[in-house]
A protein has these predicted regions:
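A structural-propensity feature for long, helix-poor, extended segments
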Residues: 208-216
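C-terminal domain-closing interface element
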Residues: 216-239
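Hydrophobic alpha-helical bundle signature of multipass membrane enzymes
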Residues: 25-209, 223, 227-230
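Intrinsically disordered, compositionally biased terminal peptides
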Residues: 1-30
Length: 239
């Protein structure tokens, strides 16, 4: 009888431990999901104020864009993306590193596409007057924490920009260039797409972005150009 009572006590204690562990895990995941860029870093004044300066045209575009939430910090998808960043970091080579450093500046990003001078001016205007203000506004809305704050194995190779992760600005802007140029030079589409994809992936290799940041940036680039319309196309319209 004593042995039976002892077994019951042991089983009860095990049950309590399991319950506490379960609650601890739930609490931990809840805390992880509460992490944002604003709670871990400071927004830049320019980046934060972009949303307050949207003109009417950009506001109309924004209203018609697909606003898709990013995966929760505790989600399986985010954990998979974090592991993917760690893997990409291990594969980082000297060529990638040089590209990552150079691509911090816009002139080095657009240069890769080999645009003509007049095309460059039109594309500059499109990116800085349309694309950038819109994606910065969406970044502010989502305020996604950077990957290195969810996985300490991720150490960014360059300074983290002063704004949230989602969507990737580099991806949005690079794919905007690729889509615009492909409309004018369809025979070079594969080349432009490869350049844009590498620029976006470099930000993941650098430890700055999740894959979902890059994917959403690509989607936004396509949708923004579609909403601008053929009449106002940066290279083919009166824009």
């Amino acid at each position: 009888m004593k042995s039976k009572n002892k077994l019951i006590v042991i089983l009860f204690l095990v049950f309590l431990v399991v319950c506490r562990c379960s609650k601890s895990v739930e609490g931990f995941e809840k805390n992880i999901d509460d992490l944002t860029f604003s709670k871990t870093q400071k927004w830049g004044k320019f980046e934060w104020s972009a949303a307050d300066k949207l003109n009417r045209t950009n506001q109309n575009i924004l209203r018609n864009l697909p606003i898709i939430p990013f995966p929760k910090n505790s989600s399986y998808q985010t954990k998979t993306e974090l592991a993917d960043i760690v893997k990409k970091r291990k594969e980082l080579n000297e060529k990638h590193m040089k590209q990552i450093v150079a691509e911090r500046e816009w002139k080095n990003t657009i240069k890769q596409f080999g645009v003509k001078v007049d095309e460059g001016k039109r594309l500059d205007n499109y990116i800085f007057q349309k694309v950038q203000p819109i994606h910065l506004t969406i970044k502010r809305h989502f305020d996604r924490v950077r990957p290195s704050f969810l996985d300490k194995k991720i150490v960014p190779v360059i300074r983290i920009p002063a704004h949230g992760a989602y969507p990737s600005g580099h991806s949005t802007e690079a794919w905007s260039l690729a889509f615009c140029l492909s409309d004018k030079y369809p025979e070079r589409k594969n080349k432009y797409y490869a350049i844009a994809n590498n620029i976006a992936t470099n930000r993941e290799r650098a430890g700055l972005h999740y894959k979902s940041d890059s994917d959403y940036g690509k989607l936004l680039a396509r949708k923004i150009l579609d909403l601008v319309g053929s009449e106002n196309h940066p290279l083919l319209g009166k824009y």
